[in-house]
Amino acid sequence: MVDTVLYFEGERYNTYRLVRAVKNRFGSTNELGVFEMRDLGLVELENPSKILISEKPKDVAGSVIISTVEGTRPMLLEMQALVSPTSYGIPKRTATGVDYNRVGMLLAVLEKRVGLQIQNQDVYLNIVGGIKINEPSIDLGIVIAIASSFRNVAVDETIAVTGEVRAVSFIEKRIAECKKLGFTKIVIPRNNYEVVKDTKGIEIWPVDNLRQAINIVLGGNKE
């Protein structure tokens, strides 16, 4: 009988390594530990969010900070998107760190519901740091990164994005992590708003749909 199963993940040319629990008889699963390979060996990163977003470029379209929760640990990550006209008959779509099929679905939603004409665009997506995330709550960050690159409008660096438009779990932890790292604005699903509306020190923008979220983040229009 196996008590615990751990996966050791990491890209070959990346200094960060992940230890992910997928089975644990004595605690929760899907917990994540982040380590860095140094001259003394693997060293735990006590605040991985700060390190993983520290090199985020300023005023660059297609880059957005997203909030995710792995197990019970909230983390902020940088989502990067590049959208450019295709040179081929069929547009190329590449996703690193996120589920490829889910990205395809979100692109279809952007075309149908938001009206972005990306059917003839190559789309490249990447989560910085070599981390793979399957949580549905990053969907909103994905579509905003794509829209930002497509419109060539940079996302305000003081804004973080948490959750899909439906309510997400651990909303208090996500907002606390954003506040800890100095973010002053955050976009969340409206269904989560009542729980956190009295939070001090950060401006909370609730959204009902993708179009509204994109207009707020890229255009500053809260209506």
Tell where the protein language model's regions lie, with residue ranges.
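Peripheral, non-AAA+ core regions of ATP-driven protein-machinery
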Residues: 1-66, 73-223
